[in-house]
C-alpha cells in the first residue's frame, strides 16, 4: 500500500464533492483509520479506497453542525470565504486568515 501526501491541511476549509456540506479540517489520517463497520456501511459503488488520506472535519450543512470523516477524493477547497459556524471551531483554531483557519498552538510538556 502506497501512502500519498495529503492534498489538504489542518485549517483548510473544504466542501464535499457530492453531498451538501462543508467544514474545516482539524485532523488528518494518512490512510483510512476508522472501523471496518463504518467503511462497509458506505454503498460499494461509492466506497472510497482506504489507501488515501482521510480528513476529520468540523462540518456544517444548512440544518446542523457535526463532525465528519471524509476521504480525500470526495473533498475540494471551499472558495466561498465564509467562516465555518461549527461551535467547536474555537477549540482548535484562533482566527480565519486568507480563507483558512490558523490552528491554536498547544504548549509541549
Q: What kind of feature is each model-predicted range?
A:
Residues 2-5, 9-10, 25-96, 100, ...:
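Basic/aromatic-rich interaction segments and small domains that mediate binding to polyanionic partners
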Residues 15-24:
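Short coil-to-beta-strand transition motifs
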Amino acid at each position: 500500500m502506497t501512502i500519498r501526501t495529503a492534498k489538504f491541511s489542518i485549517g483548510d476549509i473544504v466542501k464535499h464533492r457530492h453531498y451538501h456540506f462543508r467544514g474545516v479540517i482539524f485532523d488528518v489520517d494518512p490512510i483510512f483509520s476508522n472501523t471496518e463497520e463504518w467503511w462497509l456501511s458506505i454503498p460499494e459503488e461509492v466506497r472510497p479506497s482506504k489507501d488515501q488520506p482521510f480528513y476529520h472535519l468540523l462540518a456544517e450543512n444548512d440544518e446542523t453542525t457535526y463532525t465528519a470523516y471524509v476521504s480525500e477524493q470526495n473533498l475540494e477547497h471551499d472558495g466561498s470565504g465564509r467562516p465555518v459556524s461549527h461551535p467547536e471551531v474555537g477549540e482548535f483554531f484562533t482566527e480565519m486568515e486568507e480563507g483558512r483557519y490558523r490552528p491554536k498552538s498547544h504548549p509541549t510538556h
